[in-house]
């Protein structure tokens, strides 16, 4: 059973009305788009069955909660183009980016306002994902990183970028490692001119700021 997800960094699908319209442009069908994926992830080739959309809760609309929405995108299915499942996570967390683990069995989705990370099992029953864990101690476990932004798959682990810190709430932040099942591993603070932390400086400044992450594999 194959599946794919779209996130704001790679696709404009941000809200329910938007992505329902977007489903109609999957012509003739939804195919895997690997352009934003980690090279450590198992590759998907061919027809997708489902699209997972991590959506923002809106006060006064439905239950008002952030939720993971599953859409059937297989043209051979009787539910093609329809929402087949929704899963609310409780409250509004400023739903933002999401990403698969390297084995694509779990989808990690972050909330910027609450610094929570939600881990969904999308492998056992791809049509009906299950919320299997909520990381609600991200700030404490990471040593002060705030706002989990980008999720990036490593072999057996997930790397999370943070937008800020809980000391001065500025841009200095870190990369935070977890195991695929959500156990904290390590925090790697971004290099500064005062402390490069073993990094090789290639630009003019090292200011400790952090936003996104990509890997340049060397083969």
Enumerate the language-model features and the residues they cover.
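Bacterial N-terminal signal peptides
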Residues: 15-27
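Short, solvent-exposed loop/turn segments at conserved positions within beta-propeller repeat blades
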Residues: 61-64, 112-115, 166-172
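Asp-box/WD-like beta-propeller blade repeats and closely related beta-sheet repeat scaffolds
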Residues: 123-212, 216-217
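Blade-loop segments of beta-propeller domains
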Residues: 80-150
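Residue-level detector of Asp-centered blade-edge/turn motifs that repeat once per structural unit
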Residues: 45-47, 102-103, 153-155, 216-218
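Bacterial N-terminal signal peptides that target proteins for export
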Residues: 2-18
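A short loop-to-beta-strand structural motif that recurs across blades of beta-propeller domains
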Residues: 67-69, 116-118, 174-176
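Beta-strand-rich domains and repeat architectures in extracellular enzymes and scaffolds
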Residues: 33-73, 80-105, 109-112
């Amino acid at each position: 059973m194959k599946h794919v997800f779209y996130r704001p960094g790679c696709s404009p699908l941000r809200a329910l009305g938007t992505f329902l319209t977007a489903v109609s442009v999957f012509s003739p069908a939804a195919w895997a788009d690997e352009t934003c994926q980690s090279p450590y992830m198992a590759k998907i080739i061919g027809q997708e069955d489902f699209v997972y959309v991590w959506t923002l809760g809106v006060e006064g609309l439905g239950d008002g909660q952030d939720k993971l929405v599953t859409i059937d995108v297989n043209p051979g299915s009787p539910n093609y183009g329809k929402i087949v499942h929704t899963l609310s996570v409780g409250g509004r967390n400023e739903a933002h980016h999401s990403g698969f683990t390297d084995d694509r069995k779990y989808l990690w989705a972050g909330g910027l306002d609450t610094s929570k990370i939600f881990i969904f099992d999308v492998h056992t029953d791809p049509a009906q994902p299950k919320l299997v864990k909520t990381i609600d101690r991200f700030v404490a476990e990471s040593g002060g990183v705030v706002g989990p932004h980008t999720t990036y798959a490593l072999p057996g682990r997930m790397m999370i970028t943070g937008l800020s810190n809980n000391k001065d709430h500025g841009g200095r932040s870190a990369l935070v490692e977890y195991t695929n099942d959500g156990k904290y591993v390590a925090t790697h603070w971004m290099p500064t001119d005062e402390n490069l932390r073993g990094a090789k400086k290639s630009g003019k400044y090292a200011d400790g700021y952090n936003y996104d992450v990509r890997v340049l594999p060397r083969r």
